[in-house]
Amino acid sequence: KAFDFILRRYAMGMYAKYVPGDLHIRHLEALLHELADAGVTVYPFISPIHVTHLELMAEMNLINDYANWKRKLVQVFSEVNQDLPAQQQIVLWDFSGYSEITTEKVPDLQQQQFMRWYEDSSHFNQDVGGIMLDRMLGRQSVDSVTEIPFGVVLTSDNIDVQIEADQRNSRRYRLDNPEEISRLQKMLDSLE
């Protein structure tokens, strides 16, 4: 499939060597405080990686770490926002869930087809970027193509509900796409 090269790189590199830690989270918190103190408006988001990455993380037993990373992000944003007036609150958007965009079918490499939403499994195209900007800025997207809302604001009030929704959607995706899950498993087996 078209994404195999990138997925293998992640499986052998970043995901295989992943060690949970808070160093980057602490750096983010310091940066958010600096930006807020300087009066800079930021629009942070979790990238809409293709679900093959989420399922690869699940196959590598990293999906709970990913969920915990999201929880830590929400905690950081909540703590930073405590020190900010209402008009300066920083909103964290999550576009990484299961949507019509992130579940786009991956073409076979031999078909040489272009995908509507992705350049590769971790790089969305400018059309997706435009939809994301519209969502974050509160504009009606010109290309409202998704029946399921794309992107959600993460807060301490909804993070666990969103993670549970991702888990449900993963189970549904796995049931509906067994060949994709089997392909990921075979790819991981070939790396051992």
Which residues fall in each region the model found?
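Secreted/periplasmic serine-hydrolase-like ester/acetyl group-modifying domain
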Residues: 1-37, 41, 141, 147-192
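Conserved, well-ordered alpha-helix/loop/beta-strand core segments that scaffold catalytic motifs
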Residues: 1-83, 88
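Generic detector of bulky aromatic hydrophobic side chains
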Residues: 2, 42-45, 53-54, 81, ...
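Short, loop-centered acidic/histidine patches that primarily coordinate divalent metals
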Residues: 47, 95-98, 127, 135
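Short, surface-exposed, charge-dense and proline/glycine-enriched linear segments
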Residues: 72-81, 119-131, 181-186
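Flexible internal linker/loop segments at domain or repeat junctions
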Residues: 84-117
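Histidine-centered active-site loop/cap adjacent to the catalytic His
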Residues: 112-163
